[in-house]
């Protein structure tokens, strides 16, 4: 279709009937800030694809501009020009934001002088070729307007001669011609802006401090309610798991206030954290308690509310000064350290009425069960994603930036020290720090390095360039640390600092809410440490609207951990990780944003592809973490329901027949027994059906287990009522063939004794297995797990098929789900016209070492059209080409499946049905000379989504 028809069809869908063509990419859309979509995302999408842009926004702030800085930088590098018009209306637009825009060579900025009439425009126009996209409505270029506010905007598509577009551009050009060049008015406007801001500050200083008590936030309220319930039921221990910055210390203070102990002990691992905890408790309790400190420097043994470091308290001559039941209530902070002997000694000695443990990350790689220490009583669990959704944290703008190439080599795990501290790299770090900026009057940054020597040299280099900095390590005294933090955070301090360099002493516990920029100039060690370091900037603070996180990404082998950490997805599913890298900015809650430059994305994709998650050591670690949390042996469903590693990784491992096999290898406490025949039965289901890509086989098995029989009609009814699948008798018949081993000759060979049914009745063998409780438990677990996978991952089927758009399928999956009577996957390579279907499998990036005659030029022409080559030695009159050409007459359904490269494994993304419209006879080179081949162009029924298109096209 041409663009004019696309726009007309889009208008019909938008204004006549929404079901007309809902996949049309040109339809007018209503844009607001909702879960999974922000106005910001639409603007970013258009900026990334445009040839030119025009923006008119009454108000522009640094907060609104910062999440777009990566996009503007890439536009500058590509030479894409834009015009941005703003105003001095209400003196609201931030001069710092205007200066930032002014620093970009490709953007021209003007300021309209508001005199009599207000200036309220909020419009964004993007041109790509002869197509224009406009977004007009209520959203200014401010952070909240683009991310969380209730805003109403309309997005429309127009050709150059469209009336609405011409009126809009005409108005923009008129205002532009009347506006002032920014350099002519910015100095005067900045003075006006600053004087107004100072007046506002002055008014705030005259306000009296509120005398109201502190009010618990949503996390703290839920935690206190859970804790009360545990205490009332007679429990004496509990664990609080909550993301860094959500207010764990205050939560514990409110809980202790609720309990009202006579004597109380708070245990931490650093004196500085103990002092911060005392301040928090004083804010809650006011002057009603006697607070004391027990550290190397203070010995307030007699205080009723005692805050102690573990180093001091664990000394034999210190803790024995107290009776075992001295304290009614004990809080242990950063309790994931409790596996250490010093913590064990304290926990074994004291006998409080109640003990509360607090941590952001209870999982430990050394096998210590933190949950067991607290009787598996999880009072509250708030991870990063939950905390962002609840608005408990300061919004962050994360930028994944490619680290510098030094002497033609990219920084990696083996880069020599002198290259890490070279002049070029120092200048690069400072350049990026300045460009991406910060919220507030001056920069207050933490820089995490990989080693002390690097931190020292970088700090010296920063100081030499006029950026005051200092290094803090575990070797520094408590007073040195406190002095450095004061110089960094206090605007009245002499010898103010801009940067503190460190390796790991700020990973946890220390509260520096003023931090407005975090630089990560080291490889990611683990998702936990990544979140701990990112979390240093996430505490809310007055006049801090957001924190900037700059992650300098080299060719590190652990780069795959970055999307795992940011998403909180612990499934270790490679497709989930890739998906977050593509779409993370669209799904991250609240006003936060995530951006990667193209090189960084490629490096992370390479890391994902080159890393094996099918490691038994990883399986055991994740299994133990979940076992500790639950206090029992977890089943497959437990992994899924607790958001842990996807157990399909275990089931698909070549060394595992089924989950039972894994339990026997991984857990010495597991003493149940299954026969070889029972294991074989579980293996068939685990390897072939547990993925949940079709529910039919699983429902038949479930019916056999509970009823002893099934009928086609009963399964058809179940599919209709529980899964909204209509009129699918063919798939039911296909599922019966699969379970009877008629679908696959290989299955018949591998499972010669396997039998689930006799006609529509349960087989005697299956009935006998089910009498064994262990077998029954395992088979129901794998069936229910598969059905849950289907509901959550594969139920959005398209066009009446058993296939879900953008889900991934193997060739065997496709044969089964297209209801082919036999598994032809072993001979199904590029495509096959069979059973009135034609699946096409494309590997987008082909290996260099394949033969010339198979180097097919398969590629997207655009998001709607795919250009594909048949196998060689075919002509326009060849049988299969004619079959494809006559698809309408024969009702042939053509399905397109694509994977980026062989590094992704055996599965392909399903791109939906396609229709051929152009056939060209051409040739392809081979060792025997040019061979005939046919190039066919296909229209996609549903245009490929932007993220996947960019992924295939190497735009990332």
PLM features per residue range, with description:
Residues 191, 195-218, 227, 434-435, ...:
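Long, largely alpha-helical accessory region at the distal end of helicase-like NTP-driven motors
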Residues 275, 293, 298-299, 318, ...:
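Conserved helicase ATPase core of P-loop NTP-dependent helicases/translocases
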Residues 378-446:
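Conserved interdomain linker/interface between the two RecA-like ATPase lobes of SF2 helicase motors
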């Amino acid at each position: 279709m041409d663009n004019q028809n696309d726009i007309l069809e889009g208008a019909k869908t938008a204004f006549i009937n929404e079901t007309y063509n809902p996949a049309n990419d040109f339809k007018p859309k209503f844009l607001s800030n909702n879960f999974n979509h922000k106005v910001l995302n639409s603007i970013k999408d258009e900026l990334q694809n445009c040839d030119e842009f025009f923006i008119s926004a009454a108000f522009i702030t640094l907060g609104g501009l910062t999440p777009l800085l990566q996009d503007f930088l890439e536009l500058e590098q590509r030479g894409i020009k834009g015009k941005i018009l703003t105003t001095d209306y209400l003196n609201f637009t931030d001069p710092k934001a205007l200066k930032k825009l002014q620093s970009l060579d490709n953007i021209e900025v003007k300021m309209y002088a508001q005199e009599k009439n207000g200036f309220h425009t909020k419009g964004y126009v993007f041109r790509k070729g002869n197509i224009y996209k406009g977004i007009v409505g209520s959203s200014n270029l401010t952070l909240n307007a683009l991310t969380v506010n209730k805003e109403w905007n309309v997005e429309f598509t127009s050709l150059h001669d469209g009336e609405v577009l011409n009126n809009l551009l005409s108005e923009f050009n008129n205002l532009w011609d009347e506006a002032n060049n920014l350099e002519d008015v910015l100095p005067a406007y900045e003075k006006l802006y600053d004087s107004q801001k100072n007046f506002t500050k002055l008014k705030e200083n005259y306000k009296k401090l509120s005398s109201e008590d502190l009010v618990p936030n949503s996390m703290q309220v839920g935690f206190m309610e859970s804790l009360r319930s545990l205490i009332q039921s007679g429990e004496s221990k509990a664990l609080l798991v909550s993301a860094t910055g959500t207010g764990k210390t205050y939560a514990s203070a409110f809980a202790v206030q609720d309990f009202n102990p006579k004597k109380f002990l708070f245990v931490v691992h650093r004196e500085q954290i103990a002092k911060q905890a005392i301040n928090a408790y004083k804010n809650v309790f006011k002057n009603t308690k006697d607070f004391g400190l027990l550290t190397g420097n203070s010995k307030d043994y007699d205080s009723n509310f005692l805050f102690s470091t573990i180093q001091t308290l664990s000394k034999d001559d210190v803790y024995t000064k107290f009776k075992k039941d001295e304290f009614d209530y004990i809080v242990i902070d950063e309790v994931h350290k409790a596996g250490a002997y010093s913590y064990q000694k304290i926990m074994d000695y004291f006998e409080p009425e109640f003990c509360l443990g607090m941590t952001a990350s209870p999982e430990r790689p050394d096998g210590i069960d933190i949950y067991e220490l607290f009787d598996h009583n999880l009072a509250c669990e708030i991870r990063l994603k939950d905390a962002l959704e609840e608005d408990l944290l300061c919004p962050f703008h994360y930028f994944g930036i490619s680290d510098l190439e030094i002497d033609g080599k990219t920084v990696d795990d083996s880069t020599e020290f002198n290259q890490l501290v070279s002049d070029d790299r120092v200048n690069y770090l400072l350049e990026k720090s300045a460009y991406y900026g910060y919220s507030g009057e001056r920069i207050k940054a933490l820089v995490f390095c990989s080693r002390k020597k690097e931190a020292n040299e970088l700090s010296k280099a920063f100081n030499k360039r006029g950026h005051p900095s200092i290094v803090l390590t575990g070797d520094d005294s408590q007073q040195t640390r406190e002095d450095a933090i004061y110089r960094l955070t206090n605007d009245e301090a002499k010898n103010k600092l801009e940067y503190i360099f460190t390796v790991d002493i700020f990973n946890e516990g220390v509260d520096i809410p003023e931090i407005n920029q975090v630089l990560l100039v080291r490889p990611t060690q683990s998702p936990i440490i990544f979140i701990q370091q990112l979390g240093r900037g996430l505490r809310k603070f007055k006049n801090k609207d957001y924190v900037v996180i700059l992650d300098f990404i080299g060719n590190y082998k652990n780069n795959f951990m970055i999307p795992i950490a940011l998403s909180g997805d612990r499934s270790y599913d490679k497709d989930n990780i890739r998906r977050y890298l593509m779409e993370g900015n669209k799904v991250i809650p609240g006003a936060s944003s995530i951006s990667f430059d193209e090189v960084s994305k490629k490096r992370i994709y390479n890391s994902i592809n080159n890393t094996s998650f099918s490691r038994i050591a990883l399986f055991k670690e994740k299994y133990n973490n979940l076992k500790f949390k639950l206090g029992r042996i977890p089943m497959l469903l437990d992994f899924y329901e607790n958001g842990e590693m996807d157990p399909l990784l275990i089931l698909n491992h070549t060394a595992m027949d089924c989950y039972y096999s894994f339990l026997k290898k991984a857990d010495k406490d597991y003493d149940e027994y299954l026969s070889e025949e029972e294991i074989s039965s579980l293996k068939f289901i685990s390897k072939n059906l547990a993925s949940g890509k079709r529910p039919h086989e699983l429902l038949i098995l479930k019916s056999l287990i509970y009823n002893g029989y099934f009928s086609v009609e009963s399964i058809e009814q179940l599919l209709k009522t529980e899964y909204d699948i209509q009129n699918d008798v063919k798939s039911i018949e296909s599922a019966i063939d699969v379970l009877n081993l008629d679908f696959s000759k290989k299955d018949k060979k591998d499972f010669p004794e396997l039998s689930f049914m006799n006609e529509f009745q349960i087989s005697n063998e299956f009935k006998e297995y089910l009498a064994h409780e262990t077998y029954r438990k395992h088979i129901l677990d794998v069936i229910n797990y598969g059905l849950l996978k289907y509901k959550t991952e594969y139920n959005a089927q398209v066009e009446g098929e058993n296939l879900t758009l953008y889900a991934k399928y193997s060739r065997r999956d496709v044969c089964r789900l297209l209801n082919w009577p036999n598994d032809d996957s072993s001979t199904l390579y590029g495509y096959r016209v069979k059973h009135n279907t034609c699946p096409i499998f494309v590997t987008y990036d082909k290996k260099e070492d394949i033969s010339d005659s198979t180097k097919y030029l398969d590629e997207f022409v655009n998001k709607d059209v795919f250009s594909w080559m048949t196998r060689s030695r075919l002509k326009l009159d060849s049988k299969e080409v004619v079959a494809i050409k006559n698809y309408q007459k024969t009702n042939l359904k053509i399905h397109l499946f694509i994977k980026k490269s062989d590094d992704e494994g055996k599965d392909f993304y399903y791109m939906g049905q396609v229709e051929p419209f152009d056939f060209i006879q051409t040739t392809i080179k081979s060792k025997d000379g040019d061979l005939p081949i046919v190039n066919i162009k296909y229209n996609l029924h549903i245009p490929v989504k932007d993220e996947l298109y960019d992924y295939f096209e190497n735009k990332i």
